A protein has these predicted regions:
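Glycosyltransferase catalytic domains, chiefly GT-A lineage
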Residues: 1-276
Length: 276
């Protein structure tokens, strides 16, 4: 049985973290536009020919949607967004998924329960911009007209497990479902959370839905913001050093404790006003 843990990154935007712990028997693969520095624990590969034809956002979506095409000899895959830090051996999580006999493994959304609330939120925070408002409204109206139940599976998609089903009808069904997901992304908004519930409803894939979310405290993942800058790059470098070499843990943890305990509160204190 071959399993791949993989991510896809645009290094001008994404930060890459070295996994804290290895997952024996699971091959960790990183696709990116160039080889990252100061990162260990990933097998780096250049983007595939299909990814190279796309802009960075769509290249990531292609990798996210089509692991069975990218890894034709794999039986299972675990996709993770580049800004997730893998904090533990993922084999127990994989074992849960395999035992469920599901085609795809997903995590419930941490704050919203359906695509209608998600679309309104995306409008409010600018993830769907005014020129796309009508397209977003058309999208959710189309899904409702096509029979998507009012109560449906609604997930956050930064971690996805899949059973590839090589040579089986289930494998062909998974690939067809992912192709439908890609088509929805091309037709409507680029928010894949809005389109996946319809894909799951239409395809009939068997879903393993965990009862916890990877954004909440858990043994397997920690999530960091995408923002980049000199201070963020230094932070990433130190995190990766800490996890790759025990020698770095004491000074880094000591410096971080000093910052949190003394420097950060002092920096945040308002300066007293001068009298007179």
């Amino acid at each position: 049985m071959k399993t791949v843990l993989y991510t896809c990154a645009n290094l001008a935007y994404d930060q890459i973290f070295s996994p804290v712990a290895p997952s024996p028997g699971i091959t960790p693969v990183l696709f990116s536009d160039r080889r990252p520095r100061f990162v260990s624990g990933w097998e780096w590969r250049p983007r595939t020919e299909e990814m190279a034809k796309l802009n960075p956002t769509l290249a990531n979506r292609y990798a996210k949607f089509f692991p069975a095409r990218i890894f034709p000899d794999a039986d299972y895959s675990i996709y993770t967004d580049a800004n997730n830090l893998v904090t533990a051996d993922l084999n127990p999580l994989l074992a849960e998924f395999i035992a469920s006999d599901a085609d795809i493994g997903l995590f419930p959304h941490s704050k919203r329960r359906d695509i209608y609330a998600e679309l309104e939120f995306c409008k409010e925070v600018g993830k769907v911009r005014p020129p796309e408002y009508a397209l977003g409204d058309e999208q959710v109206a189309f899904y409702r007209a096509e029979g998507l139940p009012e109560e449906h599976v609604f997930t956050e998609n930064a971690v996805i497990l899949r059973r590839h089903g090589r040579g089986e009808a289930r494998g062909a069904a998974l690939d067809a479902a992912m192709e439908l997901w890609w088509d929805q992304l091309a037709r409507f908004t680029k928010r894949d959370q809005l389109s996946l519930p319809f894909v799951l409803h239409r395809s009939g894939l068997k879903v393993k839905l965990w009862d916890w979310n990877y954004l909440s405290p858990n043994p397997y993942f920690s999530r960091y913001p995408h923002r980049r800058g000199p201070l963020r790059d230094i932070h990433i470098f130190l995190i990766n050093k800490r996890h790759s070499n025990a020698f770095w843990r004491v000074p880094i943890d000591g410096a971080y404790g000093l910052y949190r305990g003394y420097l950060k509160p002092a920096i945040g204190k308002p300066k007293p006003r001068r009298q007179g």
